[in-house]
Amino acid sequence: MSETPVDPQQPWPGLASFTEETRSFFYGRDDEITELSRRVQRKLLTILFGQSGLGKTSILNAGIVPRLRQEGYCPVYVRIDYAASTEPAEQIKQAILRATESVGRWTRPGTAVEGESLWEFLHHRDDQLLDGAGKVVMPLLIFDQFEE
């Protein structure tokens, strides 16, 4: 995620989205952030869908992600590049490994086994991600711009 500089005197990033770094300037959507955060915690799949320009990426990056990070989630941002030679499932596996390596350690460290499905990758190790204090952290897959 690239950081967008925000002027405190005029804290609107224009067409750019708010980020975790600029969340202190993101106002007025607390009820939506609370509801969507609860929904993510209760459901295996939550879809945030709407017209372009409504602030979906901003509410995600500046609202939901910081709140869920405090609740023990590790956001894994995934944007599939269909033009790449790497299969989408492999891109997702690599995004998970990259995002989680800075958070802590896996209880059964390993890498992706060539040829395994994404489901197998997510389930075969009976693994947990632990932070530096030994608390379990839950990876949260975020597919932004998924409609592309």
Segments and roles (model prediction):
Residues 1-148:
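Amphipathic helix/helix-loop-helix segment enriched in hydrophobic residues with interspersed Lys/Arg
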